[in-house]
Amino acid sequence: MSPPPTPPRRTPHFGDLTVMSLLISSLVLLVAYIAIRPRFSHGRLLVDQLHDLTAEEVSLLPEGTIPVVLGRGLGENNRGFKIQLLRLVMQRSGAPHAIGLTASALSQDAAVDALATGVVGGTDNPQAITVGAYGAGPELNRRLRAIPIPITGGMLGLRVGWTHHNRLAGLEGVHDREDLSRLTLLQGQGWSELEMFDQAGLRTFATPSQNLFRLVSEQRVDLFPQGVADVQAQEAIAQKWSKSIVMDPHLLIAYPFAGFFYVNHRNEALAAAIERGFRRAIEDGSYQELLERVVMTPWLKEQLNLSQRRLIVLPNPEGAKALEQVQSNHWIVPWETLSDGQINRGEQLCALPRFQALCP
């Protein structure tokens, strides 16, 4: 009896190979992920994939790596100037670090409270924030440790305003502080500007950050002044609320003011790294290059129309005390000249070399 015939060998089809390849690839990726997950933050540092940095990731950082978790503010993302500057500063510092934004936005009050605890993670600081970028003020300087180098060279004290287009006609007639005092201005709760506006005799309404553009869209305020370095990042948020929210083209409100990086008083390593790296970035020109590329953009130049604005300078005696440690060569805005009344029009600012990127 002859043996049974051997069945023909089945030739694998393309679809079989594809499915098998996908299964093998998926298995390899899974094994690789499990293997590298404990070193995720270290790998993040090496490949410069700097996005959000969560409390869990901070807890997994190698010993000796400084966690640099910047509090996310209104409209901020990983393309914003503050986080890009902080990346540059930390790179220049030479300190081992991992950096990112908090996973979600924090009000300034909540962020300052968390930073002041000195705890990274846990119920008192669930987003593990280690550094904030805020307008300088005596109370803030008491609660936290300031790195006294202006984040935008003092441009935070140059304010343009978001408004409803129905309010533009009224703003056109504003020429001085007395005119400005007849308006209702808007600011966020806990912001350092509130006390200064009160002392200047201005009428100001404060609200949590999530309500700011809603109040503008509902025409419950006349003007929401913001630093010229911040408005481009905020435009998308403004437009989501209402197409009727526009930038006022008439006024530039100025007062001696600056934003600093702030850390907990006991965070010596991070404070020293930020100050060292910031000074190096100023000295080698990379800070000015970043400022012109990210802040002084063609969009801002067009929307700001600086040469056509009327300048209203406000006193800020309390704020000036918080700025006493700033070295003169770290300022971009000439506050002494502005404060004594020598400059009262935007076109005069355009004559200064450091402002020419914002002017025709």
Question: What would you call each of these model-derived segments?
Answer:
Residues 60-77, 172-190, 223:
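Short loop->beta-strand "edge-of-pocket" segments that line small-molecule binding or catalytic clefts
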Residues 85-99, 173-179, 188-210, 235-241:
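Ligand-binding cleft/hinge of the Venus flytrap
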Residues 52-142, 274, 354:
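Extracytoplasmic small-molecule ligand-binding "clamshell" domains
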Residues 283-360:
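An extracytoplasmic/periplasmic, membrane-proximal ligand-sensing/linker region
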Residues 116, 130-143, 224-244:
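A ligand-binding cleft/hinge motif common to bilobed small-molecule-binding domains
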Residues 145-195:
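A conserved helix-loop-strand patch within extracytoplasmic ligand-binding domains
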Residues 154-160, 239-275, 297-321, 327:
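Periplasmic-binding protein-like
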Residues 83-93, 165-168, 181, 256-300, ...:
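Extended ligand-binding regions for polar small-molecule ligands
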